[in-house]
Design a protein with these regions (language model features):
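Post-transcriptional modification and biogenesis factors for structured RNAs
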Residues: 1-228
Length: 228
């Protein structure tokens, strides 16, 4: 399973360099950047110190949605609670989650937001799972480079495992399930209940492969019973 690190609108070249260095140290190889050219500044390469190959391989995108176009499962980091988001995985909880996903997902991604404001609610909604680092309240944030290091360290075991031969098409099960669920809620005329819609969408990413397949079967049976 590929696991690119996505930085959304990083402002400081030094932070991009620090993130690249953290990735290199822990065995990660692919970085994507959204709406920023900070990685092109000399300071990024100076701080990267030996991780120039990661900077050289950076893929740039205009939007986060574009950066996720080939991603089957995405995890977004956030440092603060948003009222509409209720479940946050810790970095430690992500490892078993991704170890299960790697059996059927070809590409996952870990997303980091802006240094000053993080990810917008609209960007967080693009992710399958949200995660945050529990911290002491009087010092409630990590800088970008530190945050990337924390997550890369926690997930480094994934980089040491041999690749898994994925079943064709399985990686798209989650996205297909999201679309199917949204369509069903619309047919049931409950799509305007935003609280319920948010609750459903936030929990689909937590499903394992067997659960995802079973829910597809259940939705299929429900769809057959509904009038056209």
């Amino acid at each position: 399973m590929r696991l690119p690190i996505i930085l959304v609108s990083p402002a400081r070249a030094e932070n991009v360099g620090a993130a690249a260095r953290a990735m290199k140290t822990m065995g990660f190889t692919e970085m994507r950047i959204v709406a920023s050219d900070a990685h092109l500044q000399p300071a990024a390469r100076w701080v990267a110190h030996g991780a120039g190959d990661i900077l050289d391989g950076i893929r740039h995108f205009d939007t986060l949605a574009d950066a996720l176009s080939d991603v089957d499962f995405s995890i977004a980091t956030t440092a603060r609670s948003r009222a509409k988001f209720h479940y946050y995985a810790t970095p430690q909880q992500l490892l078993p989650m991704l170890e299960e996903k790697r059996q059927w997902v070809g590409c996952a991604a870990l997303i980091f937001g802006r240094e000053d404001s993080g990810l917008t609610n609209e960007e967080l909604e693009l992710a399958d799972v949200l995660t945050g680092v529990p911290m002491v309240a009087d010092y409630p944030s990590l800088n970008l480079g530190q945050a990337v290091m924390v997550y890369c360290y926690q997930l480094s075991a994934l980089m040491q495992q041999p690749p898994v031969e994925n079943v064709a098409g399985d990686g798209q099960q989650l996205n297909a399930l999201r679309l199917r669920m949204a369509a069903l809620l619309h047919r049931l005329e409950v799509a305007d209940d935003q609280k319920m819609v948010d609750w459903v969408q936030q929990r689909l990413g937590l499903l394992e492969q067997r659960d995802t397949a079973m829910l597809h079967r259940l939705l299929h049976d429900i769809e057959k019973k509904l009038p056209e």
